[in-house]
Amino acid sequence: MSTRRTLSVGQCMADHGRIAHMLRSTFGAEVVAADTADEALERLHQESFDLVLVNRVFDRDGDSGIDFIRHVNADEQLRKVPVMLVSNYEDAQARAVAVGAQPGFGKATLDEPETIDLLRTYL
């Protein structure tokens, strides 16, 4: 089986590190960071990913993760890639799903069995 790839978008370094560590240790996944929407879109158009994890508010520039998800799902080439919002806020999760994301998880539940089961579908 080939290594599954995840694009982590808009996370601060500490959160990206926690997410990447969990995905590597649990699934053997490769995790690539993108700080901005433009960087993430460029990578998505040039590389193959099995999952995209998007922060609710991008650490680098304050961009909206919901807007990014909306943009990805409006792009014919990208909409087939599963996208999840990383947020502890239920209302943000509901908005993300409404614009095309898969049900996501919060950083507070990163290591919980339910989150691991959710991610297992894609990784």
Residue ranges of model-derived segments:
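Conserved acidic segment of CheY-like receiver
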Residues: 3-14, 19-23, 52
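Short acidic, S/G/P-rich loop/turn micro-motifs used as interaction or catalytic elements
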Residues: 12-16, 57-61, 90, 110-111
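Alpha-helical interaction/dimerization surfaces of two-component signaling modules
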Residues: 22-26, 43, 95, 99
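Acidic, metal-coordinating helix/loop segments flanking the phosphotransfer/catalytic sites
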Residues: 35-51, 57
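Short amphipathic alpha-helix used as the core "switch/output" element in two-component signaling
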Residues: 63-79
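Alpha4 helix (beta4-alpha4-beta5 surface) of REC/receiver domains from two-component response regulators
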Residues: 64-67, 88-105, 109
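A short, hydrophobic beta-strand element within the central beta-sheet of small alpha/beta folds
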Residues: 79-90
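C-terminal output helix
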Residues: 109-119
